[in-house]
Amino acid sequence: MKEIKDFERIKIKIASPDQIRNWSYGEVKKSETINYRTLRPEKDGLFCERIFGTTKEWECYCGKFKSVRYKGIICDRCNVEVTHFKVRRERMGHIELAAPVAHIWYYKYIPSRIGLLLDITASSLNSILYYEKYVVIEPGDTDLKKMQLLNEDEYIEARERYGMSFNASMGAEAIKTLLENLDLDELSSKLRIQMIDKDDKTDKKLLRRLEIIENFKISGNKPEWMIMEVLPVIPPEIRPMVQLDGGRFATSDLNDLYRRVINRNNRLRKLLLLNAPEIIVRNEKRMLQESVDSLFDNSHKRKVVKGSSSRPLKSLSDALKGKQGRFRQNLLGKRVDYSGRSVIVVGPELKLHQCGLPAKMALELFKPFVIRRLIESEAVFNIKRAKNLIEQEVDEVWQILDLVIKEHPILLNRAPTLHRLGIQAFEPVLVEGKAIKLHPLVCHAYNADFDGDQMAVHVPLTPAAQAESWALMLSTNNLLNPANGHPIVFPSQDIVLGLYYLTMEKKNVVGEGKKFLNFNNVILAINNRSLDYNASIYVKIHGEYKKTTAGRVIFNEALPKGIEFVNKTLSDLELQILISKVYVVHGSSIVIEMLDIIKELGFRYATKFGCTISMSDIIVPDEKRTYVERANKEIAKIQNDYAKGVITGEERYNNVVSVWLKTNEELTNKMMEILKKDRDGFNVIYMMADSGARGSRNQIRQLAGMRGLMAKTSGDIIELPIISNFKEGLSVIEFFISTNGARKGLADTALKTADAGYLTRRLVDIAQDVVVRIEDCGTINGIKVETVKNGEEILESLKEKAVGSYSIERIKNPITGEIVLDANEEISEAKIELLEKIGIEKLVIRSVLTCEAEHGVCQKCYGRDFSKNKPVNIGEAVGIIAAQSIGQPGTQLTMRTFHIGGVAQAGSEDDKISLKNAFILNGIEGFNVRVDNGILFTRKGTLKIINVFYEEKIKNIKEIKVLDSQRVIKGIPLFIDKKGSEILSSYIGYVKLRDDNFFIVSEEQEVSLKAGTKLEIEVGDYVESGKVIGTFDPFAEPIIAEVKGKIKFKDIILGTTLKEEINTETGNVEKRITDNVFESLDPRIFIIDSSGMEVASYVLPGDAYLQVEDGQSINIGDIIAKLSKGSEKTQDITGGLPRVNDLFETRIPKNLTEMAKVSGIVQFKSIQKGKRLINILDEYGVEHKHYIPAGKHLLVRDGDVVKAGDMLCDGRINPHDVLEILGGISLQEFLLAEIQDVYRKQGVSINDKHIGVIIKQMMKKVKIVAVGDTNFVYGQKVDKHTFYEQNRKVIEQGGEPAIASPILIGVTKTSLNIDSFISAASFQETTKVLTDASIAGKIDDLRGLKENVVIGHLIPTGTGMGLYKKIKVSENIDSEV
């Protein structure tokens, strides 16, 4: 017999009535279950032994045959076959239905599948099936139409009128006849013609009908099979009946549901034999339909069937659905034996690969192994005696347990397991007590602490499982974080503090300035107390004296040999950098040795130095009062401006918040400065924060500075700050304000955890079948990577972006012409350094986004596996790693939606512009006007600048060795100075000779400016670093006059488009344009010159505050109106988790911007239906219409030239628009940048390739826009590879290929549309997925991980891949010659 598990694909179809009868071992005729006296199954009942098999092993029902030797004999008295009782798990029965019944999945679920085939609505279908209306099947030669519905009266009338010349009927029989009469081929071609004729080709109903018809044709299912004549009865062991204490029975709900069906079926059969009146028969048929519906899906009905305890009964569908359903409860997650759990405590004495296991627990877990050893050692001779010995806990048992445990790994898991490092293997060490001991350095990977956390222990039993634990899961093999390649095993808290203390330098202590020949002398001096740990000394290293401290010598002495001398104060970051460096240079074995040394040293010296905190360590700066007084003065001035009406209420609020944030920042800086100087840097609070052991600048600020501004529950900032700190104590009002944020914090955390968990689940589902399957897909496409900058600050270097990837193109040294990097070569750290040295700033690399492997990805496109720092192996489940890498930090992301000017940005809003580097202004772009003392930008603008890296006066140069504008790299001779020495370049850039200066400058860069910015420099100016070059209003966006003249209002009508508000606080009148949209009114301001001509026009958006009067004279640069930033309250910046969710689900943002579809000239048209029409005239003179909601702030004006993809009004970008206008590559870049932005702001580092894997899955499908000669349907969404494959076949046969456009689908939808129906069904909407899959006769190729777990195969990754399955091991012994 072929091994049952040895199959490669699985198919799902609709079972035909014959198929169901084939499966069956007999018909269930009675609704009885078991006899209440004998407790044996009733004959022909739901548990009948004749049908389902015997309940007693190798014995028939009546007891005539009792032995295994009669196997297979059918008893002549009771007709029961002599078999094993386990057949009751697999033998099915059936019920012959007295009337056909429709299957609820195919008629009730929306869209109704039967309804689509017959083209009738769901309600009409229901009325036919529930015997309310007749349907005309054959109209004959009458006036009736086929499929026409008739109620009782109409039917009687038609019969009287036409007699028997037409055929009409009701119930499932009628539907069955209609389905049998369908000609699918004819219907398909008819619908295809209809689709071509219809101009609106994307008629969804037509598309759905065509898809269903094609699916029926391909799968070989017959439509009439959706109507059932025979009902299968599942095996009795799957719907068991068990006796409880007290003689009562507990039974599966399915038995009750089956009994209702059998009772009604039998009753109907009797009524049909008796020729009962039609109305009674019809009612019984309807009840039969209802009972079968309840059996298949009880929860989907309006009136659910309830059991004795008035709870809804669980039907077959309910058993599959949801978290408690078969898929998620029993198939994807199972409870495991040989496991235990206990509280964890710290085990500082353990080695990195060890964990402490309580002896009692170990004895229980390893019991079978101990029993086997006891019997082998002949201490006992049977299992029962061995168990007794174990219970008595005699000495031999402990000795044997020690032997058993040696080199038998165990797995430790801490819930929640957010990434693969949540389960690791350790070698157990027996410990007393009942708590598991955990190594302190692995806490970070588990996110564990010792405040009562519990962990589970699992014992891998088979040799293969043990080998896998040793080779792959041992804690020492998991030193790096798979998300980014940074070490995940590193010291924190006490250890960091101990090492920080040890390696710090202190002035004026014992032994300062002494010289030592070697390390041993230093340690002797310390032991003799003639040298302080923190004393600055000189030690001979590699033949020369080096200045260091005694503590650093101790640290370096303890490190493994070969690691270069570490001569700095070690904070947590420094330690992580050190671990990283040692890993790269010396490999993991040295790192493991070093980590245990670091742990040991850290704990020892933290104990030795024993730092404590007292109130006197918390130093409140004396300047605090001055700062607060100054802030109050500034606020008084702001209030005064507000009272005069110079600024609006929102500007006032924003300014006040800004003042307090600045004050708080200044005070914090001062406080940290004071703490740093206190006790020469040995202030304990400062040390804890500076070393990164515990606490942060923010927390110290609350202790010794001021608590600062608090946020309300809504996320708004309360403008009244808490000026006190915890040392001074809070006043009553301050305490009350500070309670505001606390509750929100707790609620957020609870919601966030569930949200992040769900995000991970969706990501795992979409990416679970992405496995590295081949070595090289042979693509020639790649993506461009360059350094990510914010202004001048480098956020992510080229190294972080490209290291570990493969290059697409060959790169040569621009000067020597030699090949630095070949095509398809891995970009190592050394290569990147070389590239940076020769000035390469952009690279095209292979990426998962452009991989062309048919399934999964290829090795070359994926690049490096970060958890091992080596190229990825074939068989690595990179999809799941990607999902975990993105989901795991999800719990750290905030939930709060920030307001503009709220905590999110207020810190950075400054009203002055200055740049860090010196630069030369090359040019200006954007609309600007000249005013008295500078240039005023009336709209957004750009400065074209070149940064100056190096400058020298030409008079100090003897001979210049380079040309003007020449590109130079590091190490190139630039000039010979007056002293005759050759000066080499230490920068990459361009030479610029100007006036009497020699500069090295960068490539031209752009700096964006806001509207209303006043620039105080001119083109061509050389500007020193840090100099203020311009000012702007951070809290309002002005609309500025670009010409001189008189103001003329158009459609600005008081009470309609203009609202005058009298400010109750100040008594000033504020004029505001309303948000209301009127068809005919378009509020604008014209500027008229002296001759009465209109020279400029300005559209006024909703919520703009007017600053001018009608008829008033105006000069260039005057403000006409301003938009307060506060009025952008509605546009909350969705931060953190909700933003990531929106991006992965590709939701259309609320406050949407309109992007220019083409490049061209803007033309303003009228307002239609509340939307402003803007045309863009492209280079061919074609107009492209854009509709923008009136009242939105426009970013373009009439006559402007725009590029495709430019924003026409403010708002958020819709990712679908990016795909449509700018294409797939731009969309990938957009999504990648947006998602990374959220994580980067939270300080989380995730490599691009992980996000790339998910985006690749989201863009897997294409939409058919032209069918050609293929079998596709217009508007159908198909997999890219299916599309290419079909086209290839059509082209080979000389046909016309189909055309498709790329589409973007959110993660939930993608998971449901995945090729594997098992995976999709186990994700969400189980019944819907199975319904569609059965109609299409889908085949699951079992490629992904989930589907293999469900059916009980090994997952197809690593050694479970088909690649390795077929390997045969054979011994090849050479015979001696």
Swiss-Prot record:
InterPro entries: DNA-dir_RpoC_beta_prime (IPR045867), DNA-dir_RpoC_beta_prime_bact (IPR012754), RNA_pol_asu (IPR000722), RNA_pol_N (IPR006592), RNA_pol_Rpb1_1 (IPR007080), RNA_pol_Rpb1_3 (IPR007066), RNA_pol_Rpb1_3_sf (IPR042102), RNA_pol_Rpb1_4 (IPR007083). Zn(2+) 1 binds at C60, C62, C75, C78. Zn(2+) 2 binds at C777, C851, C858, C861. The keyword Coiled coil does not apply. Binds 1 Mg(2+) ion per subunit. Binds 2 Zn(2+) ions per subunit. The RNAP catalytic core consists of 2 alpha, 1 beta, 1 beta' and 1 omega subunit. When a sigma factor is associated with the core the holoenzyme is formed, which can initiate transcription. This is DNA-directed RNA polymerase subunit beta'. The lineage of its organism: Bacteria, Pseudomonadati, Spirochaetota, Spirochaetia, Spirochaetales. The gene is rpoC.
